[in-house]
Amino acid sequence: MKEVSPTGRVLGIDLARFVAIVGMMAAHLLAPRSGAGPYSIGWLTALTSGLPSALFAVVGGFGVYFSSRRYLAHDQRAAAVVSLLMRGAVVMIVGFALELLPDHPIAVVLVFFGLAIACCAPLVLLPTWILVPIAMGLPFLGTVGGYGLSQVLVAKTPQASSSIREAVSALFFTGYYPAVTWVAYLLVGFVAARFLFDEGQARPLAPRALLLAATGAIAFGAGRLISALAMPSAVEYLCQTYGVGTDRAQQYIAAYHRGVPLVPPPLSFALAAPHSGSPADVLVSSGVAVAVTGLLVAAFSRATSVPRVLAPFAWTGAAPLTIYSLHVALTAATWSATDAGASGGAGTWWYQSEFWGQMIIILVVGTGIGLSGKRGPLEALTSSAAQQAARRFTADP
């Protein structure tokens, strides 16, 4: 198989990023047709409900690891923290900029993602044995806080908030992608990256990656089992509380919950409703993310260069911030130009076909970035800002 020259990147991680981006694109452009008569693709809604964004966040934890390990290897702890704080700030700024686009149906993840990166900045100084219980405990905190605050605060984004209190609540607990949950995802990825890439590991990379994938699969299975056991009680609660039938209650649970559990704790702890951020949901979604990432790293663990046939996908995945922002901008442009929101465009075949058009565009852009030998423009901006911020804390920038 023909190959392109090595880049020093981890091929499996770039491919995992690509899978995450395509999954989110499918959630935004293909899944809205789920249940739409003869074009029904309900299975796709189930597949893309929360899983691609979780993969995006977990692989983001790998990015936190890669961007901080050089500083930490030289005991430049302050530089590592400041660098990540700046990265998080830049990502948040990009996210706020995307919120200024014309109306569109996408809940932009970048404001929450950037905040989560900033929150992780001091945590990278901690040993793994402390990070693991933190990652495990955050979904419990998020579920309790999110459910409690959702009873009095309704804002899902800081932009939609009517007060500072609502904005803070949306960012950390009640938003579409609350930071408390995304910090947990980032820590899962960060710990996984330590397991795979820290020096001194006894086993080769491929066996470690396969063990990681197996761990993710076990986590997924455990989460689904726990949720299945909790489902009858959750359905009964919804039926009694809202006066709905069993089928409608199950539909409520299967729908998007955007960071807020549908039933109160402690029952919500065990219910893996998509986007709820519950412990069971995080166990299921992060399990899938870890399994996918582990398998891709294992499959290409011996690659010293990028196979030519995979180069467009790897190059596109290597610029996730740029490509994701491009996807949001393209979708907003279509939504605005066609007045899709008013005309129900998300349920039409032509809106679904935009997925394939955007796929071509992002692959062309990603290939162009790869052939240039440079980073994506937003990746370069983020990296430059982080390095400049860290420079004053180290003599070796």
Located regions from the model:
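Alpha-helical transmembrane segments and their immediate juxtamembrane cytosolic regions
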Residues: M1-P397
